[in-house]
Amino acid sequence: MCDDGSKDNTIGVAQKFVDKYPDKFRLLKNEQNMGLNFTLNKCLYEAKGEYIARMDGDDLCSPERFQKEIDVLENNPDIAIVSTDMEFFDENGVWGKTNVNPNPTKLNFIKATPFCHAPCMVRKEAYLSVEGYTVDKRLLRVEDYHLWAKMYANGYKGVNIQEPLYQMRDDRNAQNRRKFKYRINSMYAHFLATKMLNLPIYTYIFCFFPIIKGLVPPFIFNIIRRNKYTTKQS
């Protein structure tokens, strides 16, 4: 665990877990808020395992998730990244699910990130070979997309398990909450990826899609989003 310069009692609560389970938790602390990219790298370089798994706060994952991801990496030495499908849930239960591509190629970077970030497991060696997450304010909120692009540009590959082994808390009625500056960041990350991966010239037009999405009225964006992810069980 790493406390990113919190000003409340977060560090005290975290310390209780360390005291109770000293063999399971290590506590790191930033003296001031350094942001997600820096903090992810700090944890990455302190981690001792061969495989690095992520999970966001307030989310849930299947008890089988880690074993299934480990099995993929153990049985496929040419694979560096493994992620899974995700379900979305709120106070009323599960309302949607992603539909990931099982074997993403460079072309899958054209329109969106090819991997869900939160449920991923990655070989530490692959992280280190690309120097982890790029610490750049222009890549805030798109650090994962840029990371995957760096890895693919360096010859690494990944796969997606087509099972919803992870549940992300997300309001089904949420409007388009991404600030416009982060859409500019997304456009910038897409330009970098298109260049790094030597994608066809025509694909540069897709770099502007994050900006176009940001111009869509929130209520329309919300309808599109629900139609994209809503499950038949909802």
Question: Whereabouts are the PLM-identified features?
Answer:
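The conserved acidic donor/metal-binding loop of glycosyltransferases
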Residues: D56-L60, D85
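Glycine-rich, basic loop-to-helix element that forms the pyrophosphate-binding segment
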Residues: N30-A47, K68
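Conserved donor NDP-sugar-binding/catalytic core segment of glycosyltransferases
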Residues: E64-G96
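A conserved acidic beta->alpha catalytic loop
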Residues: D3-G12, Q32, D56
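Conserved nucleotide-sugar donor-binding catalytic segment
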Residues: Y45, N103-K181
